[in-house]
């Protein structure tokens, strides 16, 4: 069952990609969707067997590397963390496959698209099932390549080309540091197998663990789009909307958080790395919410809401890895629902993505409105919605730690939650509730999608409504044996007891009260005092504030001016001096020129004069006699004579070269 679970998406990708012309569009749809849905059913069975019964499974496939002391086996590992990621990845992926049948129905490259989707899913499975860092790195890299292919799916668009390259190159920064971290693990521990590294971690110097942890954290920062290496995130919206749902909900962005959770027994021994995770997650949460508030493109706004993965990084910094996993699962479902709902809106209004030109779509898209309302309520952690059970718990856990950093992070993340609520209300209000602002033709043709588009929305909404309440005791219940991903227990992991019983009620309710209050005030101002907002926007202060946040804190401008430009100049000089300089001089260009000069010089020795030929014969005779003589005497003198003759005969060659 477990091998079938792994291999089915790959088979679907191969058939759709290489035999697409034979099976046709319908055949590609059928094969890829059936393979992924079957894999999802098997993943649910694996979740019940491995997760609930707490029976880890390992499958030894083959020996991969056997080089001196490095011995790497290709082993697939199924434990609580792996099967939880399976549920997240495969349920969302199967629904995205079904949704894409209708959404991409008019695209001429359906087979290629579904092949990429299935390959993406397969490599994500490889990433989470690997038993060592090297197998994980294989999935990590190919997932990045698949994201490049999917974002650049419409390769005739220049914007898609630029965005895919930006995503690929930004992730290369994190991949480079992750590679350095893997080499540091290999150098320090002599192995890259999870079990070996985690078993030896308590006996190593904290500085070594800190260095490795920082490298892993930077790798996760790039993949999970934390602040600093987040610039690829909105640009990845150039791909089709189902791609955005798959990348930003369940696959690529969760890979970085998965790496931190998988490495929890290692980074737990470095307080520096945990504090860095804590602050990185908090800053990312506020940063993304402020930028998202000033975005006007529907998909880009939801892209910045994906940076709410900072909440999971906060949970990692609090050593509450099971809480991070719980929020990851919840986040995947409601974020996929938001993106697929956005795709339904874009599909209905002739591909227009500026939600300022929507308005009044509630009457035309009632199903889409309700599913996006449900997902938005979860995003802002309204009580008894799925996001409430994990997001608010993370905030309460931060306050429940009772030390300075976590308390400050609680208030910082609360501010981020406030602005997240504000832009969620902004999207719903301007898209569905306000007066129509778009052209009449959009409303004439606006309609809900067909069965393939609406069914995934309904399924996700049902899963989303019930999953948080049903699974909260499984993932973070005090008596559960499921969340055994910390590998060991210490008093710091019992933070949930303090969170549950010791945190004052005021601080439990504060994020919700502030979020709802700010949203209500903003809607009232927009509805009853619009001139006040317009006058403020056109004032110098309002203009500067709007420009600052709309330009994303000028971080991309800083990168382009001071980093990218310098790197390009350095690359140009390096290419000029090495690739176009010394390498060519010593390589094909220089060798060709030297041989040509040598042949020309030798050709000039032929003068057609008898006395010259007699001189050559005499020199050759003297050479052979001296060869016999000096072989029995001083070899150094012989070498000196040979060198002198060579210099005399080739003086012209050397000067010319």
UniProtKB/Swiss-Prot annotation:
Keyword terms, alphabetized: Electron transport, Membrane, Mitochondrion, Mitochondrion inner membrane, NAD, Respiratory chain, Translocase, Transmembrane, Transmembrane helix, Transport, Ubiquinone
Record membrane topology: Multi-pass membrane protein
Gene name linked to the record: nd5
Pfam family of the protein (one): NADH5_C
GO molecular function: NADH dehydrogenase (ubiquinone) activity
Organism: Emericella nidulans (Aspergillus nidulans)
Principal subcellular localisation of the protein: mitochondrion
Compartments (UniProt record): Mitochondrion inner membrane
Function: Core subunit of the mitochondrial membrane respiratory chain NADH dehydrogenase (Complex I) that is believed to belong to the minimal assembly required for catalysis. Complex I functions in the transfer of electrons from NADH to the respiratory chain. The immediate electron acceptor for the enzyme is believed to be ubiquinone.
Identification of the protein by name: NADH-ubiquinone oxidoreductase chain 5
EC category name: translocase
This enzyme's EC code(s): 7.1.1.2
Keyword Transport: yes
Catalytic activity: a ubiquinone + NADH + 5 H(+)(in) = a ubiquinol + NAD(+) + 4 H(+)(out)
One GO cellular component term: mitochondrial inner membrane
Transmembrane regions: 1-21, 30-50, 81-101, 113-133, 135-155, 177-197, 211-233, 241-261, 274-294, 309-329, 330-350, 364-384, 408-428, 451-471, 475-497, 509-529, 610-630, 637-657
Protein family: Belongs to the complex I subunit 5 family.
């Amino acid at each position: 069952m477990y091998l079938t679970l792994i291999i089915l998406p790959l088979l679907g990708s191969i058939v759709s990609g290489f035999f697409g012309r034979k099976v046709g569009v319908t055949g590609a749809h059928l094969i890829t969707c059936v393979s992924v849905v079957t894999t999802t059913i098997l993943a649910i069975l694996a979740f019940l067997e491995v997760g609930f019964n707490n029976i880890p499974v390992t499958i030894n496939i083959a020996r991969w590397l056997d080089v001196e002391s490095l011995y790497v086996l290709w082993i697939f590992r199924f434990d609580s963390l792996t099967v939880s990621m399976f549920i997240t990845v495969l349920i969302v992926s199967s629904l995205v496959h079904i949704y894409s049948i209708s959404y991409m129905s008019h695209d001429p490259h359906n087979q290629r698209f579904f092949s990429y989707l299935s390959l993406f899913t397969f490599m994500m499975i490889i990433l989470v099932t690997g038993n060592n860092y090297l197998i994980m790195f294989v999935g990590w890299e190919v997932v990045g390549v698949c994201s490049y292919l999917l974002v650049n799916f419409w390769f005739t668009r220049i914007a898609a080309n630029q965005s895919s390259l930006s995503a690929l190159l930004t992730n290369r920064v994190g991949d480079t540091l992750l590679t350095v971290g893997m080499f540091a693990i290999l150098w320090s521990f002599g192995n890259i197998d999870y079990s070996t590294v985690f078993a030896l971690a308590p006996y190593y110097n904290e500085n070594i663990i800190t260095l490795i942890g920082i490298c892993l954290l930077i790798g996760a920062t790039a993949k999970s789009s934390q602040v600093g290496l987040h610039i690829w995130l909105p640009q990845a919206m150039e791909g089709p909307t189902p791609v955005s749902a798959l990348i930003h909900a369940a696959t690529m962005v969760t890979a970085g958080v998965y790496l931190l959770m998988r490495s929890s027994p290692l980074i737990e021994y470095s307080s520096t790395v945990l504090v860095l995770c804590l602050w990185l997650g908090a800053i990312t949460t506020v940063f993304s919410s402020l930028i998202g508030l000033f975005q006007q493109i529907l998909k880009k706004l939801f892209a910045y809401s994906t940076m709410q993965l900072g909440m999971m990084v906060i949970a990692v910094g609090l050593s509450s890895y099971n809480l991070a996993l719980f929020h990851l699962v919840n986040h995947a479902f409601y974020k996929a629902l938001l993106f697929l709902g956005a795709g339904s809106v874009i599909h209905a209004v002739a591909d227009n993505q500026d939600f300022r030109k929507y308005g009044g779509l509630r009457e035309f898209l009632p199903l889409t409105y309700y599913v996006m309302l449900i997902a938005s309520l979860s995003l802002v952690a309204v009580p008894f919605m799925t996001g409430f059970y994990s997001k608010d718990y993370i905030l309460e856990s931060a306050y429940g730690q009772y030390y300075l950093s976590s308390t400050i992070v609680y208030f910082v993340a609360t501010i981020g939650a406030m602005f997240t609520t504000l832009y969620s209300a902004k999207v719903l209000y301007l898209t569905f509730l306000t007066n129509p602002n778009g052209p009449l033709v959009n409303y004439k043709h606006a309609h809900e999608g067909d069965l393939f588009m609406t069914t995934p929305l309904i399924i996700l909404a049902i899963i989303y409504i019930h999953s948080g309440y049903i699974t909260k005791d499984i993932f973070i219940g005090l008596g559960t044996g499921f969340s055994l991903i910390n590998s060991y227990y210490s008093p710091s992991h019992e933070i949930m007891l303090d969170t549950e019983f010791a945190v004052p009620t005021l601080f439990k309710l504060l994020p919700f009260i502030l979020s709802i209050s700010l949203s209500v005030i903003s809607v009232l101002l927009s509805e009853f005092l619009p001139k006040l907002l317009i006058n403020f926007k056109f004032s110098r202060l309002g203009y500067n504030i709007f420009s600052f946040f709309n330009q994303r804190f000028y971080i991309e401008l800083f990168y382009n001016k001071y980093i990218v430009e310098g790197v390009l100049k350095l690359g140009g000089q390096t290419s000029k001096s090495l690739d176009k300089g010394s390498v060519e001089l010593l390589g094909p260009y220089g060798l060709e020129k030297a041989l040509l000069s040598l042949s020309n010089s030798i050709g000039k020795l032929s003068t057609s004069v008898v006395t010259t030929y007699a001189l050559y014969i005499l020199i050759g005779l003297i050479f052979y006699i001296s060869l016999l003589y000096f072989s029995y005497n001083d070899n150094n003198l012989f070498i000196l004579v040979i060198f002198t003759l060579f210099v005399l005969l080739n003086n012209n060659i050397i000067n010319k070269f």
